[in-house]
């Protein structure tokens, strides 16, 4: 055999064994991260911060973790700034980009002064409890801020329990994968010492129109003073983002195993403490949160001084 023929055979051998793996790696996995509410829709209101700010901060941190550690994943955000986006457009963004996964990030609330706390992850379905229905009603009420919402959502009334009957008859072919991701998310939250309130189902419009595995995450209760304080700090937001990233890694590895792909996900995330570039969305958001904390601190100090003088 000539030297030239020998090299040719070796080349074919290498292509036969390694090209399939390379081709599998070339398939980009797309995840859409949806920061709930925004712009004229503040979401749930806390004492010192609105839901929309927490959602955006955690969404950007989660996206950055994936971008820094998962080379075969494309991250798309429904919003990276404080702006209002219609619920159906959030789903459309995922569908247009042929996303493999949709994660909508929210913050829960009940009546002020409540001690209810903990994380929940929802998949699409009929709410089996009054509590789940109330959460869905709260999140779906964002459509009331949209133009022509009655036409856009075919007469759906977010405040009417009758409107939610349609979800009982909806069959979602991605339900199994959605529940799998939701379960991993709740496990990760439990591992970082958050109260695990479980995987639940409810009729969320933003999940109804997506054509891929989808979940809606409630990070905690902004109506609970301790949880609000945790969620408004950079350290708390980092922990929540890292828990979501950990769950994403496990889901993605299972996905790659089923598809026969080579996973490009790194399990241990790079620290999310880096300083964002000046003028970036994350930098502007950090400055707003710092200003709010300083204002609150000054207000508390003034109040204490007044009380001391009055004694």
Segments from the language model and where they lie:
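Bacterial N-terminal signal peptides that target proteins for export
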Residues: 1-9
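Bacterial N-terminal signal peptides
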Residues: 9-18
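Catalytic-core regions of hydrolytic enzymes
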Residues: 24-156, 171-175, 179-183, 238, ...
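Active-site-adjacent mobile loop/cap segments within catalytic or ligand-binding domains
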Residues: 43, 162-265
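Flexible hinge/switch segments at interdomain interfaces of large molecular machines
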Residues: 152-161, 216
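Polar/charged, compositionally biased leader and regulatory segments
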Residues: 162, 289-294
């Amino acid at each position: 055999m000539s030297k030239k023929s020998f090299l040719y055979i070796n080349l074919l051998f290498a292509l036969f064994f390694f090209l399939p793996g390379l081709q599998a790696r070339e398939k980009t996995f797309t995840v859409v991260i949806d920061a709930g509410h925004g712009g004229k829709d503040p979401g749930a209101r806390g004492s010192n911060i609105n839901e929309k700010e927490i959602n955006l901060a955690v969404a950007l941190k989660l996206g950055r973790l994936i971008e820094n550690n998962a080379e075969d994943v494309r991250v798309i955000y429904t919003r990276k700034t404080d702006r209002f986006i219609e619920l159906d457009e959030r789903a459309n963004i995922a569908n247009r980009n042929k996303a493999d996964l949709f994660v909508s990030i929210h913050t829960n609330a009940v009546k002020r002064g409540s001690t209810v706390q903990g994380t929940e992850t929802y998949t699409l379905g009929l709410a089996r409890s009054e509590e789940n229905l109330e959460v869905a009603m709260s999140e779906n009420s964002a459509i009331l801020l949209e133009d022509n919402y009655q036409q856009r959502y075919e007469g759906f009334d977010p405040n009417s329990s009758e409107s939610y009957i349609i979800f009982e008859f909806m069959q979602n072919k991605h339900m199994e994968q959605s529940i799998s991701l939701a379960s991993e998310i709740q496990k990760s939250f439990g591992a970082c010492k958050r109260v695990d309130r479980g995987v639940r189902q409810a009729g969320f419009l933003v999940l109804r129109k997506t054509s891929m595995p989808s979940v809606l995450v409630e990070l905690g209760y902004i109506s609970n003073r301790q949880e609000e304080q945790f969620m408004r700090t950079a350290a708390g937001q980092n922990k929540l983002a890292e828990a979501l990233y950990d769950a994403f890694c496990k889901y993605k590895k299972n996905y790659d195993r089923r598809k026969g792909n080579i996973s490009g996900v790194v399990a241990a995330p790079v620290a999310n403490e880096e300083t964002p570039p000046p003028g970036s969305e994350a930098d502007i958001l950090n400055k707003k949160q710092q200003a709010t904390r300083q204002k609150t601190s000054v207000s508390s100090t003034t109040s204490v001084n007044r009380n001391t003088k009055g004694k």
